[in-house]
Amino acid sequence: MHRRNILSAALAASGAIFAAGSRSARAQTQPPSRDAAKVVYHLSDLEKVQFALGNIDNHLAGAGGPEKVTIQLVVHGPALRAFHAAAAGPETARKVAGIAKSSVKMAACGNTMRGQNVTLKELLPGFTVADRGGVVLIAELQAQGYVYLRP
């Protein structure tokens, strides 16, 4: 009886290893579906603006270009100050223009805009307003299957 249990366990383990290897091979040969490549970047820390914009550039390149991934950047809180056109540095302006050309959607929190007394026209080009708030938009995007990233 003991030998039979050992044999059964060995066969079960072999089957599990084979199945896992088979799934892994399929995952490497099949391209990801469009639905699997939706990401929302949450940015509220002023000191992380350049880092987050660099992450988005790297994400686009690593995914194989803007046609392979849908990215939405949602900015609120102190980080929004970096995107005021009058105060944005040249590096920020260049990176924002680049990701906007790559079809990255950018939304500014309407609550933060009111708090900072800034209008959409005063932000760098490419932004829309999250009228009900940045965190509300983030939650809605997550409900739509977006992966949440906060650099």
What does each model-identified segment do?
Residues 70-82:
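Acidic helix-start/capping segments at beta-turn-to-alpha-helix junctions
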Residues 42-53, 83, 87:
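Short, glycine-rich nucleotide/cofactor-binding loops
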Residues 20-41, 48:
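C-terminal segment of N-terminal export signals and the immediately downstream linker at the start
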Residues 52-65:
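Histidine-anchored nucleotide/phosphate-binding helix
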Residues 36, 66-68, 101:
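Extracytoplasmic
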Residues 40-42, 72-74, 105-108:
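Structural recognition of the beta-strand scaffold that forms the well-ordered cores
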Residues 86-151:
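A cross-taxonomic marker for long C-terminal extensions/tails that follow the last structured domain
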